[in-house]
Swiss-Prot record:
PROSITE patterns: EFP (PS01275). This is Elongation factor P. One of its GO terms (biological process) is peptide biosynthetic process. Involved in peptide bond synthesis. Stimulates efficient translation and peptide-bond synthesis on native or reconstituted 70S ribosomes in vitro. Probably functions indirectly by altering the affinity of the ribosome for aminoacyl-tRNA, thus increasing their reactivity as acceptors for peptidyl transferase. One of its GO terms (molecular function) is translation elongation factor activity. One of its GO terms (cellular component) is cytoplasm. CDD domains: S1_EF-P_repeat_1, S1_EF-P_repeat_2. It is found in: Cytoplasm. It comes from the Bacteria.
């Protein structure tokens, strides 16, 4: 059992009514009057829906034991993404709604990890950084580096990130998958 005050982003837990929830954001909130509460943004792992809620810090939940296996992203068809276990060659179908954030960072044949809760496939874990190619960005303007504000760039997966002014279309970039931000040129 884990207390609500110990839940952090990325953790998965089971509620008293059996829902499997993943913490997207968690923060302590102390109103002017009253007791401290934990405000959380959660994703229902099975349905993919996200919602905001709050819990008392002392509320207890069962921490979900999540196992991972190495896999490869194969392709997406309609509203389903297909993955293959690289050890057993078993294939898994995951609804896109459950992995839409992760799909922004991976291309076909990318290595990932499939997450299981018991025998149930619940998600995908992507590497901490990935290399993606810029498909579209504004041209560099001479002397624009003075402001240092950057410019938006569309990557080959459709992800849009803010990049420095010297980045041009066709360049490979290293992207931080946890924050969805530019790290460096590859």
């Amino acid at each position: 059992m884990i207390e609500a005050s110990k839940l952090r982003a990325g953790m998965t837990f089971v509620t008293n009514d059996g829902k499997l929830l993943k913490v997207l954001e968690a923060s302590h909130h102390k109103p002017g009057k009253g007791n401290t509460i934990m405000r959380m943004k959660l994703r229902d792992v099975r349905s993919g829906s996200t919602f905001d809620t709050s819990y008392r810090p002392e509320e207890k939940f069962e921490q979900a034991i999540i196992e991972t296996v190495p896999a490869q992203y194969l392709y997406q068809m309609d509203d389903t993404a297909y993955f293959m276990n690289t050890e057993t060659y078993d294939q898994y179908e995951i609804p896109v709604v459950n992995v839409q954030e992760e799909l922004k960072f991976i291309l076909e044949n990318s290595d990932v990890k499939i997450q299981f809760y018991g025998t149930e496939v619940i998600g995908v874990q992507v590497p901490t950084t990935v290399e993606l190619t810029v498909t579209e960005t504004q041209p560099s303007i001479k002397g624009a580096t003075v402001t240092g504000s950057g410019k938006p760039a569309t990557l080959e997966t459709g992800l849009v990130v803010n990049v420095p002014d010297f980045i041009e279309a066709g360049q490979k970039l290293v992207i931080n998958t946890a924050e969805g931000t530019y790290v460096s040129r590859a």
